[in-house]
């Protein structure tokens, strides 16, 4: 720790501890920031001794400055720390990191202007971003810039082999040789399972290439051989051979484009592995906006490796079929084959807060609105409500509970004592008659035979079918079922009277209050 913190002298260390990390902040720089900066320099292949002088810090800033706009947070923090150390070596008084950055950038710009025009870094000409450039009539290989490699690694880490990785690889690997493509693949640290899938695809495609392009035979001395599958993959060929195959005058072989196509096949398999959702399973939720559903649908469609005609059919059929019922009702009203713009415009407000508010208002209105009563039913209810009859005195206008007349004793139906109206024996019999002891009736009807009445018609003779005139008609035979019913009813009446006799008098006294008030009621 002592050796690493010795990049600054004691006086400069005191000055470092006075510099604030942020303008107006409380935290200040200390020795642990110097130690962290030394460890970060090792990752960029820079020696820690460069921090001991102003010129060394200038070299570090020259390397880091182009990477700051697209760099990570650690890179930006390292650049800020080196700017502060640079200002301390240059004996510039700074209060915080922002002042140190401004002074360091001003010095870098001044040093760039002092450089001669021939050695000053300039932007490459049109097409200069390609790894292979033509200089003085010769094709020269230029290594990939760290910015390109950083963009590729960030794409893989952020998208996690989503559908965007394939077009991103196509854009970043344009014009690359197999050597450059292998360099891009080697930069991917994580996702080694996906890298292994890509290697297997490369081996399969290389074997197919060797079968389709056999070796023609011995070649004359000095003639360039034709590329094999391993040569296209960059394992058995050099960069110079790859450039010659790509740009020779006779029978050029675009080994870079062929290798890119193999990598794209492997990336497409990785996309399907990392995104197992089938497009048939993409359905709109009941409250999901239509635009969000369309975004998910086309993202899944982009990952599908099918024919364009099949994708067109999926767009025209599944997009409307898998929408929720509200959007589907609107989309079917647009006619045949509506455009995507028309569908988005028509379903713009469905599923949003506006539609929810309208549905809530309609439901609340229906709940608060009373159900209409028909006019005839209302009149009938009003007529019934006006004709209230008292069971005690028989008058109209009040109920038995409100009646002031003396309470009528006995049955309210027949007026007899000893029973109540619900147990009145003179109540009307049903279709199957009255059952014994107040239970349900039996499965035979009860026939009432009047006593003392002589039939007007003579009985029929079963043999002749008619009774002779002048003969006295005999009484009809007694029905055993009627006799059994009568006996059951008599037995039931006796049992009810025996059960009600102990508390009959107490019940009548409680009903009429004769024991308390006597005749004054």
From Swiss-Prot:
Lipid-binding residues (covalent, N-myristoyl glycine): 2
Region ranges (Dimerization/Multimerization of capsid protein p24): 274-360
Motif Nuclear export signal: where in chain: 16-22
SMART domains found in the cross-reference section: ZnF_C2HC
Pfam families: Gag_p17, Gag_p24, Gag_p24_C, zf-CCHC
Region (PPIA/CYPA-binding loop): 214-221
GO MF: RNA binding; structural molecule activity; zinc ion binding
Annotated SUPFAM superfamilies: Retroviral matrix proteins (SSF47836), Retrovirus capsid dimerization domain-like (SSF47353), Retrovirus capsid protein, N-terminal core domain (SSF47943), Retrovirus zinc finger-like domains (SSF57756)
Region Interaction with host CALM1, annotated ranges: 8-43
Zinc finger (CCHC-type): 388-405, 409-426
Region of interest (Disordered), residue spans: 105-130, 446-482
Name by which UniProt lists this protein: Gag polyprotein
Species in which this protein is naturally found: Human immunodeficiency virus type 2 subtype B (isolate UC1)
Taxon lineage: Viruses, Riboviria, Pararnavirae, Artverviricota, Revtraviricetes
The encoding gene: gag
């Amino acid at each position: 720790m002592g050796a690493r913190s010795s990049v600054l002298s004691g006086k400069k260390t005191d000055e470092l501890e006075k510099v604030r990390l942020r303008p107006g902040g409380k935290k200040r720089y200390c020795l642990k920031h110097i130690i962290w900066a030394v460890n970060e320099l090792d990752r960029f292949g820079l020696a820690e001794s460069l921090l001991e002088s102003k010129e060394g810090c200038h070299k570090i800033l020259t390397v880091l400055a182009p990477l700051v706009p697209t760099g990570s947070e650690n890179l930006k923090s390292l650049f800020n720390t080196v700017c502060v150390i640079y200002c301390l070596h240059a004996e510039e008084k700074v209060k915080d990191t922002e002042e140190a950055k401004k002074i360091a950038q001003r010095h870098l710009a001044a040093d760039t202007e002092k450089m001669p025009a021939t050695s000053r870094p300039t932007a490459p000409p049109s097409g200069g971003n390609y790894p292979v450039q033509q200089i003085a009539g010769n094709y020269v290989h230029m290594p990939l810039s760290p910015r390109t490699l950083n963009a590729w690694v960030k794409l893989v880490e952020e998208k996690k082999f989503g559908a965007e990785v394939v077009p991103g690889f196509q854009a970043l690997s344009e014009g690359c040789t197999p050597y450059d493509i292998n360099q891009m693949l080697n930069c991917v640290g994580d996702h080694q399972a996906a890298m292994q899938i890509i290697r297997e695809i490369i081996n399969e495609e290389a074997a197919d290439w060797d079968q389709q392009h056999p070796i023609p035979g011995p070649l004359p001395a000095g003639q360039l051989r034709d590329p094999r599958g391993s040569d296209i993959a960059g394992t058995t060929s050099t960069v110079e051979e790859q450039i010659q195959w790509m740009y020779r005058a006779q029978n050029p072989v675009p080994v870079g484009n062929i290798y890119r196509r193999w990598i794209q096949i492997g990336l497409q398999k990785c996309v399907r592995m990392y995104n197992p959702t089938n497009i048939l399973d993409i359905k709109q939720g009941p409250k999901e906006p239509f635009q969000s559903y369309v975004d998910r649908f086309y993202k899944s469609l982009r990952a599908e490796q099918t024919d364009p005609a099949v994708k067109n059919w999926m767009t025209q059929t599944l997009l409307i079929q898998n929408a929720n019922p509200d959007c589907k009702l609107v989309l079917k009203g647009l006619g045949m084959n509506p455009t995507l713009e028309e569908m988005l415009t028509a379903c713009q407000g469905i599923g949003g807060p506006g539609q929810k508010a309208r549905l809530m208002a309609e439901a609340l209105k229906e709940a608060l609105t009373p159900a209409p009563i028909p006019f005839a039913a209302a009149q009938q209810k009003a007529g019934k409500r006006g004709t209230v009859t008292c069971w005690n005195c028989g008058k109209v206008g009040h109920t038995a509970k409100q009646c002031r007349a003396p309470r009528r004793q006995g049955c309210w139906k027949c007026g007899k004592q000893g029973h109540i109206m619900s147990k009145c024996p003179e109540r009307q019999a049903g279709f199957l008659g009255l059952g014994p002891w107040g239970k349900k009736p039996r499965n035979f009807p009860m026939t009432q035979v009047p006593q003392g009445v002589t039939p007007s018609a003579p009985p029929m003779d079963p043999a002749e079918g008619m009774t002779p005139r002048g003969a006295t008609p005999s009484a009809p035979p007694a029905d055993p079922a009627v006799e059994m019913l009568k006996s059951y009813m008599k037995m039931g009446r006796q049992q009810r009277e025996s059960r009600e006799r102990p508390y009959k008098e107490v019940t009548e006294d409680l009903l009429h209050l004769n024991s308390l008030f006597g005749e004054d009621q």
